[in-house]
Swiss-Prot record:
Segments forming domain KH-like: 377-461
Subunit structure: Associates with the 50S ribosomal subunit.
Domain EngA-type G per the UniProt entry, residue ranges: 3-166, 203-376
A biological process term (GO) from this entry: ribosome biogenesis
InterPro entries, A to Z: G_ENGA (IPR031166), GTP-bd (IPR006073), GTPase_Der (IPR016484), KH_dom-like (IPR032859), KH_dom-like_a/b (IPR015946), P-loop_NTPase (IPR027417), Small_GTP-bd (IPR005225)
Stated name of the protein: GTPase Der
SUPFAM superfamilies to which the protein is assigned, alphabetical: P-loop containing nucleoside triphosphate hydrolases (SSF52540)
UniProt cross-references to Pfam families, sorted A to Z: KH_dom-like, MMR_HSR1
Keywords: GTP-binding, Nucleotide-binding, Repeat, Ribosome biogenesis
Organism of origin: Escherichia coli O127:H6 (strain E2348/69 / EPEC)
GO MF annotations, alphabetized: GTP binding; ribosome binding
Amino acid sequence: MVPVVALVGRPNVGKSTLFNRLTRTRDALVADFPGLTRDRKYGRAEIEGREFICIDTGGIDGTEDGVETRMAEQSLLAIEEADVVLFMVDARAGLMPADEAIAKHLRSREKPTFLVANKTDGLDPDQAVVDFYALGLGEIYPIAASHGRGVLSLLEHVLLPWMEDLAPQEEVDEDAEYWAQFEAEENGEEEEEDDFDPQSLPIKLAIVGRPNVGKSTLTNRILGEERVVVYDMPGTTRDSIYIPMERDGREYVLIDTAGVRKRGKITDAVEKFSVIKTLQAIEDANVVMLVIDAREGISDQDLSLLGFILNSGRSLVIVVNKWDGLSQEVKEQVKETLDFRLGFIDFARVHFISALHGSGVGNLFESVREAYDSSTRRVGTSMLTRIMTMAVEDHQPPLVRGRRVKLKYAHAGGYNPPIVVIHGNQVKDLSDSYKRYLMNYFRKSLDVMGSPIRIQFKEGENPYANKRNTLTPTQMRKRKRLMKHIKKSK
């Protein structure tokens, strides 16, 4: 499960600035959910290939009378949902009563907490943080988030070791594996099949969406249609339920974020605070079903969730629920709105269903299987290079400073989502429009449906870079003869 890091502290201590620093590597959108957590942002970040979800919890305000009375209920829940807390204080303002009250609450939760003193630029860090040792949270990590000072150290010496302890990462030398395959192809040898068979694994399917769009009804309808015995397998995140099931001989694991089996135990506050569980379900899934309410249309919250799904690279099936009972005129209007607002997602299948009555539900799994198969299909280097060559023949890359961009070869860089790595010269100068052309060409040629496809470009190294242009003895003799000839002709 993808770990969650929460940034907490008083207002104006620099939480949002640090949040932007942490998430910039993924260009993360940041999913803003108005109405649920108006002052809270969620984003994806990465440390040395390890992803985590970062939460900016907004300011927790309070006085010496007791900060707990001022804490927003959802901020407390954010701390509960997080795996680790970065407690931020303002080194310039010094120790405040609100800091002490927040620290007291964090100590009572026994949650892994790291104390981060921000705004230390221009100060002696050792002197600036002395007072904060009174909070009893151990070592203090001074940073200047606005300038980036100390942030890298915070990542490398605090978050990374903690994440390694949480889930050690298996190291795979992907470059060595690729070059071994490439060399084998050059020598005319067969590509060796690896042991990975995606068809033998269950498809992890997450059903996500806003509250009250019919996620629970759809989950119950799917399980009811199957007539199989299911059991709850609680995940590491509270109230997320993993439900194994089988359909048409294929195994699935339904990831239900609505807590349908523990509904009676969930308070209204926890039910509303489903954002963390939803984001973790997306990260953990192979295919995501985004459920939209046909009567309410596409909301900003739907688009935020959609942005997170796309950034995660997950396969996608869009489900428009509550389709029954709508007039033909309203249905046409809904379809026009979908085309207008979701036109940029041309790879995802859209289904119109009624989870309550079961109409259209049976067709969903065909699209789920198609999306999963597209995202996990293995394609060889020779095939990808051939497709790239055909794309270049159909539409030449643009000229850059009078020289044509040269694409040399392509190979697979990963799966789920499919990643195509293209090597060439001056590829960094390719326009966005040509990159989109290549992406669409690969999608059409490989018949990828239901899954995003990503293309990465790698610049070829110039073997003569930083080398002096020294002539060989033969070249020197030719040059002398040429100069003599030129002088005679004059």
